Each structure stands twice: as structure tokens, then as C-alpha cells.
Design a protein with these regions (language model features):
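Short amphipathic alpha helix immediately N-terminal
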Residues: 95-120
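DNA-recognition helix of helix-turn-helix
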Residues: 121-151
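Alpha-helix N-cap/N′ positions at the starts of helices
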Residues: 10, 21-25, 84-85, 95-101
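C-terminal single-pass membrane-anchor helix
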Residues: 180-237
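Σ70-family region 2.3-2.4 aromatic/basic alpha-helix that recognizes the −10 promoter
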Residues: 22-31, 37-90, 132
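N-terminal intrinsically disordered, acidic low-complexity segments at the extreme N-terminus
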Residues: 146-196
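A short, charge-rich alpha-helical start-of-domain segment used by transcription regulators
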Residues: 1-28, 38
């Protein structure tokens, strides 16, 4: 008689590769969303495990949106950590509401296209663009600050490239635990982020955002094609 199939062990190679490709971007997204790397790792571990549990029921084409949806909705990321810290150029991330910050980070840290980022947050295109506009750094006169945008994008790309070896090893352990079905510690529930009324005055020319996102994408592509990514990391998803 055949032994019953082990539903926890032996995950498909495609699933393992997908999670390996997401872990670096997911860790940076989670850390910058809540302002605390440890709290972010709790959220990432929970999202990895939750995704492992339902990936088999999804077409592979739907995997990215589902993963980022799970991570964005993780309770530890719904509010900033009590001791949240964003340093240097990333201090601009402290001001936006959690939803708006997530909209920005799904593009710059998660590497998602606009439609996928909107789907991950459960927003339509217009609502997503409004969230991005609210997350836009402003100068002293309240105008969109292109230099601050570029600085944030460059700082995020630097953080993605330069995660230290011990951090990468921890992320690999989180992935392996998720693939093995290991449970993660429970986290305290957090309040859902406040919704904001769309203020038409805060909308701004999309050529600015599009240009900066293109620069960030070009920087990420250059990093990859120059072979600077660590051998253990797959192409970020």
C-alpha cells in the first residue's frame, strides 16, 4: 500500500525558487513599511508561510500579486512600529500613512508594475495613483520634490543590493521554515490604516513619478546585469 502523500514536505521546485526570488525584496519592503527590521521579518515569515499554503491552488501567473497582497496585509505592517526608524533619505517614508507608504514601496522595493501593485492593495488604478501622490515627498512650498524622490529610490536600491550576509542567511532560514511548514510566532493585531479622503490638490504631474520609477528600474537592471547580485539571490520578483 502506498504511503499517504506528505502535504508539508517536498514543496515544488518552482515554489522554492519563487520564494527565494521574493525574500530579499519582501524583507526590504516589510522593514521600510513598518520601520523595524525584526517586526518586518515577522510579517515576511507569516506571508511566506501563508503563500506556501495556497500557492498550489493558483496559476503561477497569479503568484506575485497574491504574495505581495499577503505581505501588505500582514498585521505587523498595518501601522508603524512603536520604535520605527527611517534614516537618511528614507526618513521621507515616515510621513505618509501606511497605505500610501505601501503603495510607494510596492513599486520601489517590491518592483511591481502599477496594475499589480494596485491589485495587491485591493485598489483600482485611480485610488492607487492617489495613494502614490499622497506619498510623494514635498518641498518647503508643498510642491513635489523630485530630488527627494530620487534619493528615496536610490536608497531603497542600495538597501536591496547591500543586505549583509547574516541578514541574507536569516531570510534563507525564514524561507526554508515556510517551505517546511514551520509555524511562525503569533503577532499582536494592529489597527487597519486610516483611509484618507482624496484631495484633488495633492495630485501632481505623473511624468515626475514615471521618470523616477524608470530611473529606479534602470538602476536595478544595471545592478543585475553587471552581476553584482549575490549568487544566492534569484532575480527579485
Amino acid at each position: 500500500m502506498m504511503a499517504p502523500q506528505d502535504t508539508v514536505g517536498s514543496p515544488p521546485a518552482a515554489l522554492a525558487a519563487f520564494l527565494r526570488g521574493c525574500e530579499r525584496r519582501g524583507a526590504v519592503f516589510a522593514e521600510l513599511q513598518c520601520g523595524d527590521p525584526d517586526r518586518g521579518d515577522v510579517a515576511l515569515a507569516a506571508a511566506l508561510r501563508a503563500f506556501r499554503g495556497n500557492a498550489a491552488a493558483l496559476p503561477m501567473a497569479d503568484w506575485p500579486v497574491r504574495f505581495w497582497s499577503l505581505l501588505s496585509a500582514a498585521p505587523p505592517l498595518r501601522t508603524a512600529a512603536p520604535d520605527a526608524r527611517w534614516q537618511g533619505a528614507l526618513s521621507a517614508l515616515a510621513a505618509p500613512a501606511p497605505l500610501d507608504r505601501a503603495a510607494l514601496l510596492l513599486r520601489l522595493a517590491g518592483g511591481l508594475q502599477e496594475a499589480d501593485a494596485a491589485d495587491a492593495l485591493g485598489l483600482d488604478g485611480a485610488a492607487y495613483r492617489d495613494a502614490l501622490a499622497r506619498a510623494c515627498p514635498r518641498d518647503a512650498l508643498g510642491h513635489p520634490d523630485a530630488a527627494a524622490w530620487r534619493a528615496v529610490a536610490e536608497a531603497i536600491q542600495t538597501q536591496l543590493r547591500e543586505l549583509p550576509p547574516d541578514r541574507l542567511a536569516k531570510l534563507a532560514r525564514l524561507r526554508e521554515d515556510a517551505l517546511a511548514g514551520t509555524r511562525v510566532p503569533a503577532v499582536a493585531p494592529a489597527k487597519a490604516p486610516e483611509t484618507r479622503t482624496v484631495d484633488a490638490r495633492r495630485r501632481w504631474p505623473w511624468i515626475l513619478l514615471a521618470g523616477i520609477l524608470l530611473l529606479a528600474a534602470a538602476g536595478a537592471a544595471l545592478w543585475w546585469w553587471q552581476g553584482q547580485a549575490p549568487p544566492s539571490a534569484s532575480t527579485p520578483t
